Amino acid sequence: MRTFEKKQILKNVGSSWSALAINVIVGVFLSPFIVHRLGDAAFGVWVLIFSITGYYGLFDLGIRSSIIRYVSKYTATDDREKLNGFINTALFSYTGIGVVSMVLTTLLSSSVERFFKIPPEMHAQARLLLLMVGASVSLGFPLGVFGGMLEGLQRFYILNWTSIGATLVRAALIVYFLDRGYGLLTVALITVGLPILSSILRGIIVFRLCPVPLGLKYVDRASFRHMANYGGTTFLVMAAARLRFRTDELVLGTMMSTVAVTWFNFGARIVDYAQEFVSSLAQVFVPMSSQSEAVGNLDRVRKIYIAGNRVCAFLIFPITAILIVFGKHIIRIWVGGRYVPHSYPVLVVMIIPFALMLAQAASTRILFGLGKHQTMAAVTVIEGVGNLILSIALVRPFGIVGDALGTAIPLSFTCLVFLPRHMKKQIGVPVGTFLREAYTLPILLTLPLVAALLLTNRFFYPRNLIQLVIETLVVGSVYMIEMFWAYRTHRAFHVAEVAGLTEPLPAEQPPQAVVSVEYQGEQ
């Protein structure tokens, strides 16, 4: 890999991990602070309303990914006319979508308590909260063009650093106002207002980097066609991702209570942090595989497939072990011991299938990079529908654990049965070869860590966050020493010549559009 590629990857991934670290740290301290100030019911309403408006992301219709694609393309070819047309067409389209979503928000806010089990005393707050969050999301559509432009220009680090700034300011303001007796709506105003300000800042920055004239005269049909053709599969993936990972709170809010939403959220939130950590790395495999395929180097694609998934496994396997063994301590110290009986089972049920998915995070990115993601999108839709049906069926007899099982069962099937076989068909690496080359070393290195975790958990009981962090770092040093050995001996990233181990590929298909999608909580 060329030096500038390595620097770009390190810069973008490093800033992504920095943003994630800040989000985790803020979340660790802010979530219990908010829930203890507002109460379980109010916090559950908060999570529920954000879950509802999260579905507005489907109105994106794949436009964001097309912005990334065509900004990258037109800046590379220095085609200013097409770039101007595309950006203005995207802004025009997003403005229309924002208006529609605001109308929908107004309609929903008048009857939100009819659909969800919200305490009567919180009906008025829930309506106002939905209006505030919905308005922010609606405005976020046209403002999101600026973030898409930055991604197309490969300036992920600008996105990440502006996000870090907004996160820190948000945390400080929430603590300040809650300490002075303000409530749910004040927290909401802070939470939805700062992303708008950061988007405006990104717009100022991106127009200095890449000046684009604005006006209706630049809107054109050709750009509409490009967006429609490119965004179709992206929309399917986005809809499927919502079904997979964003229906749990709605099912619980409809069939149980907002308190159950709070219990579920604490266990699932920890899993989300693990997912974001791995996904921040995995996103670099989209352009890497796309570039390799473009020059006909499929052997390099196969090596990315094995080495990329191995790196993902190096990250998620030890994280999974730590969360399962220390999970009760994490929840107890984070939000309080009374949440452990409810939230820890959710954590365990969710982290295992998510580990299976994240250990193959490179696989899905390679499919997008090669433009061979259509079958995966269809399977994901089927999985999402199965997720929703199972969650509804299991939540009555098993409560929030049943809801978690509704997500875990179909996700495990996709990861264990479908994905490795589908990758074999697409790039020709036999399943046995893939499993052996990608996962033998990560599993062997994780086993001593598991033993150390179990031994430590038996004899030591962390009573506060500092003790928990120290205990985790001491035990984690076992794994770090092993990883240092694997790196120094070149075992960590070495991949044997795989060309001779592969099965013949089917006849090459014409290249499809490459879609850059950040999975939701695969975000």
Place the predicted regions along the sequence by residue:
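Hydrophobic alpha-helical transmembrane segments
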Residues: 131, 160-209, 226-230, 381-389, ...
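Alpha-helical transmembrane segments of polytopic membrane transporters and translocases
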Residues: 44-60, 89-93, 136, 196-197, ...
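Helix-loop junctions and terminal segments of transmembrane helices
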Residues: 61-77, 91, 152, 210-211, ...
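Interfacial segments at transmembrane-helix termini and the short loops linking adjacent helices
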Residues: 109-133, 323-355, 427, 461-462, ...
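Signature of the first transmembrane helix
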Residues: 8-73, 96-106, 136, 171, ...
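Interhelical loop/hinge segments that connect adjacent transmembrane helices in multipass membrane
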Residues: 1-9, 202-245, 284, 288, ...
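Membrane-interface junctions at transmembrane-helix termini in multi-pass inner-membrane proteins
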Residues: 10, 138-163, 175, 182-185, ...
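Membrane-proximal transmembrane or re-entrant/amphipathic helices at the cytosolic face
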Residues: 427-431, 453-523
